């Protein structure tokens, strides 16, 4: 015998959907703890549902996370659930193009706020965690947005200035309001050389 519980939701001004991920995207918070966090902020939570799969060991979300139009964690091969301004829902496969332009090159960013692999450039924001959580050596570049407080809004370009280039042996701290572009020492040599060519003050 199987029992199913469900909630019937009709969009209205008094009831609206909220996407929550805790204090950062690898927090591994439960639905209950996220609901409590929202209620501490003055919201009244009527219902909640687990919205993504994640890697148990790291908390790395497998899917896309976007709140307030800001890309918190990227993914472009899994279906995603989204909500329009009127509260209605849409389900589909996102088609993200993530690029970094520097030194005359337009280079694909492998992922944003995902555990780094050797597959290319990764970009981290303070939505990810306090550090990059990298466990192997690589190169990390601290980037400051030229417009203070600018975030990774979907469909926009963010211009940054290089603050530091680090030959990192492991995790690098992610400064509040800034970004870390990262590549593994096991990635392609040309990609490593390209990021190592960056200097403090470059944009």
Regions found by a protein language model. Name each.
Residues 188-189:
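Signal that preferentially marks extracellular ectodomain short beta-strand elements
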Residues 1-185, 194:
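Zymogen propeptides
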Residues 195-203:
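Loop/turn positions that initiate beta-strands
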